[in-house]
Amino acid sequence: MSTAAGTILTGKRRWFALIPVALGVAMIILDATVVNVVLPTLIKEVGLTTTDAEWVTAAYSLTFASLLIVAGRLADRFGRRLIFVIGLVVFVVSSVLVAMSDSPVSIIGARALQGVGAAMILPSSLSILNSVFVGKSRAAAFAVWGATIGGMAAMGPLVGGWLTTDFSWHWAFLINVPIGVVVLIGALVFVPETKDKASANGADVLGILFSTLGLLGVVFALIEGQRYGWVIATQEFTAGPITWSAGAISIVFVSLIVGVASLVALLFVERSRVASGKAVIFDLRLFKIRSFAAGNVVALVVSLGEFGLLFTLPLFLQSVRAYTALETGVILLALAVGSFVASGAGAAMAQRIGPVRVLQIGMALEALGIIGLGFAISTTVGGWGLVPWLFLYGLGVGFATAQLTGVILSETPVAQSGQASAMQSTSRQVGAAIGTAILGTTLLLGLGHFVNKDLQEAGVPSAQAEQITQVVASSAGQAIPGLGDPVIVEAASQGFSSATKTVSLVAAIFVTLGLLASFLLPRNAARIRAEGYEPPKG
């Protein structure tokens, strides 16, 4: 069956098309989480400084988040499979470049290039599914897509720990080569090309400029605000030939102002171009669709807390409980199992009670799982004490991720799938960046309070307790095992546990707010997608 935007596949072939799309998403999610495990080894073997290590992650996040909307629009205009394949090639080549790198600069540059590839893969993968699947099969495809994200986020530490421990850090990136080859062949053979044939009426150069600059500025500020100071620079910033001195107006503040101003300019430019009938990088009229507008609000809010768990829990397990990276990955597998179980049941449940209800059940399970983890965390808890709560959290992620994606895209025109997919991905990324900034600050403040308090209660002099607290906070707990004195180690571990509990409860509050926001969604969203639906005009 053909549509104006491409081909609706029927029979078994559509499920063959799902395989390379899901594997492509799995690859970028796996890579994003593997890096956290590999960083300590990179610091030792490549000579990365703490700042370099942070930029290995930040460079990827910046290019990824800032280019999602542009990549989504390019997919609609030039072909969703084409952009998916180009992104795949860029990602695999940059993975090889990371593995071959022998200096901080080359690693950071290659990671930034990886972000470019990932930004092309993610929105085009969703828009491919949205354009080639319809009805019940679309819900099932979204369920697989959502479970892939949740499962790979949990499996990343396990895979990274295994490859780094048994082989070398290079293989944590080289593993993308065989996966990429399989995905490339599958995409070329099974995935049909789809595009918006009505979009080829000029390039929105200003839209591309303002959207990229706006998201780059805002996301950079959110990532680096805690480190460099939100208004006044607390330390010198250096990036290649650029140096920003401490004591002056912070580069974070300037970046945030430029980013917000660019996004405001983007709104005016896009409204003007729509009124003139010209091509736009993003059609603002999509926000007149209730399921799309409310769904993006939910995506942003729930992402504030959804990924905070994967940020803090590995630190706790390795610093306080002294688990290895591989052992930590095994514990986190419970999350992946829960996510895959939920993906199998979610689509069928959505047909019976509606996707919005399944989404709300999922977010409720997420919140309960995080709260349970918050209360379970202690200096003596073992892996089995955390596994049930991780499994519950994984069930929630599996139910919520796919259903929210389906709801957001349920009433958007197939021809604008790339734009819509990119916006929901951007909402999640911006939410995750804000959440990481808030939860990171919460962790640091918690460490400063609880570690200092527990050390002094253990009889450590105030001045020494303050010094130890600074060491623990600056290392995000990694210095705890090396503190020596068992009394000090126990007190610092107790303080870190209390700080982690606080972070978990704050994350649960954010997920709960996302649950409350979900009641803004139309109850019948995404039950059956009507072909030929057109967005509201004007």
Model region roles, listed by residue range:
Residues 1-21, 249, 267-272, 278, ...:
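Transmembrane-helix exit segments and adjacent C-terminal regions of multi-pass membrane proteins
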Residues 2-190, 342, 346, 353, ...:
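Transmembrane-helix bundle of Major Facilitator Superfamily
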Residues 12-64, 68, 168, 220, ...:
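Transmembrane core module of solute transporters
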Residues 19, 74, 79-89, 97, ...:
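C-terminal module of multi-pass small-molecule transporters
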Residues 144-148, 203-206, 298, 423-427:
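Hydrophobic alpha-helical segments of secondary membrane carriers
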Residues 147, 151-167, 216, 220, ...:
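A gly/Pro-rich, aromatic-decorated transmembrane alpha-helix motif that marks the paired
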Residues 165-174, 229-251, 324, 445-508:
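A membrane-interface helix-boundary motif in multi-pass transporters
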Residues 165-297, 492-495:
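Hydrophobic transmembrane-helix bundles of small-molecule transporters
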